[in-house]
From Swiss-Prot:
<feature type="transmembrane region" description="Helical">
    <location>
        <begin position="107"/>
        <end position="127"/>
    </location>
</feature>
<comment type="subunit">
    <text>Part of an enzyme complex containing four subunits: a flavoprotein (FrdA), an iron-sulfur protein (FrdB), and two hydrophobic anchor proteins (FrdC and FrdD).</text>
</comment>
<keyword id="KW-0997">Cell inner membrane</keyword>
<comment type="similarity">
    <text>Belongs to the FrdC family.</text>
</comment>
<comment type="function">
    <text>Anchors the catalytic components of the fumarate reductase complex to the cell membrane, binds quinones.</text>
</comment>
<feature type="transmembrane region" description="Helical">
    <location>
        <begin position="67"/>
        <end position="87"/>
    </location>
</feature>
<keyword id="KW-1003">Cell membrane</keyword>
<protein>
    <recommendedName>
        <fullName>Fumarate reductase subunit C</fullName>
    </recommendedName>
</protein>
<dbReference type="InterPro" id="IPR003510">
    <property type="entry name" value="Fumarate_red_C"/>
</dbReference>
<dbReference type="GO" id="GO:0045283">
    <property type="term" value="C:fumarate reductase complex"/>
</dbReference>
<keyword id="KW-1133">Transmembrane helix</keyword>
<dbReference type="InterPro" id="IPR034804">
    <property type="entry name" value="SQR/QFR_C/D"/>
</dbReference>
<dbReference type="Pfam" id="PF02300">
    <property type="entry name" value="Fumarate_red_C"/>
</dbReference>
<keyword id="KW-0472">Membrane</keyword>
<dbReference type="GO" id="GO:0005886">
    <property type="term" value="C:plasma membrane"/>
</dbReference>
<keyword id="KW-0812">Transmembrane</keyword>
<dbReference type="GO" id="GO:0000104">
    <property type="term" value="F:succinate dehydrogenase activity"/>
</dbReference>
Amino acid sequence: MSNRKPYVREVKRTWWKDHPFYRFYMLREATVLPLILFTLFLTVGLGSLVKGPEAWQTWLNFMANPVVIAINIVALLGSLLHAHTFFSMMPQVMPIRLKGKPVDKKIIVLAQWAAVAFISLIVLIVV
């Protein structure tokens, strides 16, 4: 064993606040918290649907609470942020070629958003 002391650089807990890239990364990752609450709310809603009309009405009243509505809006915005970042990464991760030529990145991203809009429209019509 060596007797020398290795240099250990001190890292502050807030090191990520100094870099815009890491701040954005932390913001994007923090959006999972309202999504967890949204998922729990829906799970409780399914349970109350099984329990009967009174439990269902109680859950509907709970979902009408302004705090819950705000959490759901934040969860929606977080989901849209995730979709935006993932869709913008897609052309870099998996470049698409048609007839040997690369497809423009904007077309790939717009096609993904069009697919989301189309599927959302179908869900709205069916439900």
